[in-house]
Amino acid sequence: MSTLSVTAAPAHPRQARWTFLLHRWALVVWVTLVVAISGLLLWAAGPLADDSDRAWHQLEACRRLSRCVVDTGSYAATYEFLTYALILLPFVVAAWAGATLTARELESGTALMAWTQGVSPVRWLAVRLTLPAVVLTVGASLLVALHRFAWEAPEERTGDRPTWWLPFTFHANGPTTVAACLTALAVGTLTGLLVRRTLPALGVSVAASVLLLGGAHWLMPHLRTPVTEVGPFREGYPGLYTGVELSHGLVTRTGAHIPTPECRATSMDDCLRIYEQHGGTGFYTTFHPASHYWPLQLTTTALLLVVTALLTAASFVVLRRRTG
């Protein structure tokens, strides 16, 4: 007598296909966003930057005229719009992850159906985290690289480009945006598991992401030792508006750093007398110069990835406790 044995198909590929089918429209929207923003960034770095270059040369040539009107093109407006788009991406991810990635399946019973068909809750969650994480990392990394390419258009072509330390430009030009998307994914996933209702999970996910990412930005300048420069009154605040500033003020005779006293006088000499009455001998500025850009980016990215790992671990703990 011969015995026939039937081997069940692996659950993991089946779950991956099911996840793809369930969230295919989200994938279509994400790919469309990435392609559209990528095209606009390339347009800004090429034709728009060239138009701005021609306009700035015209402005340089007609400076001797009493009146000079030059159209500088759409580079600045387009760049600003695309920078805002990149900054908003993590919050869009949080809204989607909170509303549909876990909460909708728990609310509709789709998750329970999968668990009764031989798919463990842990594997179910692992697939739903892994596939979006890969897609988000690839797409966000491409957008960050193209944004930096558009920003690095030579200054003589585009006029005054946004300085590197402006908050939105700082994050859109580096890996913190990619890490923020992953953090938002983890926030939405955990929120969906806790709330289990689509619309409330959406709102809570976005609010929690705002708090977490805002907190990371606030901590960012404190993750590395800043530089302090001191100079005489006549030279103004040294290093001001050249980097990420933490503080500026007066240097006293004892070497202490104090806030600059308020001065409403119309002349600098009058203000200097007020400063000297407070024991001031010069100005100081504590800031992060351009050489600190990548250390700040990498430490902030590492912080966000640690938070992402903790949120992901918390998601598995919550799921295990609720499913026994």
Predicted regions and their residues:
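Hydrophobic alpha-helical transmembrane segments of multi-pass membrane transport/permease proteins
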Residues: W25-C62, A85-A95, V204-A216
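Transmembrane helix boundary and interhelical loop/hinge segments in multi-pass membrane proteins
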Residues: A97-Q117
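Aromatic-rich transmembrane-lumenal/periplasmic boundary elements in polytopic membrane proteins
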Residues: V204-A265
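Aromatic- and glycine-rich beta-strand/loop motifs that create alpha-glucan
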Residues: M1-V35, V317
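Junction motif at the cytosolic side of a transmembrane helix
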Residues: S2-V6, C271-Q277, P295-G324
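Selective transmembrane-helix segments that form parts of the transport pathway or gating/packing helices
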Residues: H23-W30, L86-L89, P121-R148
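Secretory targeting signals
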Residues: V6, V35-L42, G73, E80-T83, ...
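Membrane-embedded or membrane-proximal helical elements that form or frame transporter/channel pores
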Residues: D50-G98, F287-L303
